[in-house]
UniProtKB/Swiss-Prot annotation:
Its main location: membrane. It holds the Pfam family Peptidase_A8. GO terms for cellular component: plasma membrane. PROSITE patterns: SPASE_II. Coiled coil: none annotated. One of its GO terms (biological process) is proteolysis. This is Lipoprotein signal peptidase. This protein specifically catalyzes the removal of signal peptides from prolipoproteins. Belongs to the peptidase A8 family.
Amino acid sequence: MSEKALTLKQSGVRWLWLAILVFIADIGIKLVVMDNMGYGWANRIEVLPFFNLLYVHNYGAAFSFLSDQAGWQRWLFTGIAFVVTGLLTYWMSKLPAKEKWNNIAYALIIGGAVGNVFDRVVHGFVVDYLDFFWGSYHWPAFNLADTTICIGAAMIILDGFRKKDANK
């Protein structure tokens, strides 16, 4: 016996509006940063004793992973993002829209991934602007897309614990 396919309205694909919202907000903020802030440490804006706005280019991935390479990493991370986006969209098409937790998590990851892919393809780098620090230690700069990817991933991990506890 086969399962009845979900319509677009019934499936989690309905939650892709959130991915679009994340993408638009991410690109909009990055454009404001690029148009209104000087590049680099000397042009940082001190906001709080532990937080700066800082316009920098990231040629790698999270934590500037592989940023010192010759440029091939740009296409590797773009390819990974396309595969992940396709996979998550497929999973959303199989999930009922009422399963909000996972659909929201997937949409947050998709929106962030597409935002960073846009930067990589259009600029050749990802724009980062959030700089948190404690004393002289600075966490690697990041952006809204990175934040939504991490929140979505954390939601998926937490969901694994929720389901595990529910089976006890």
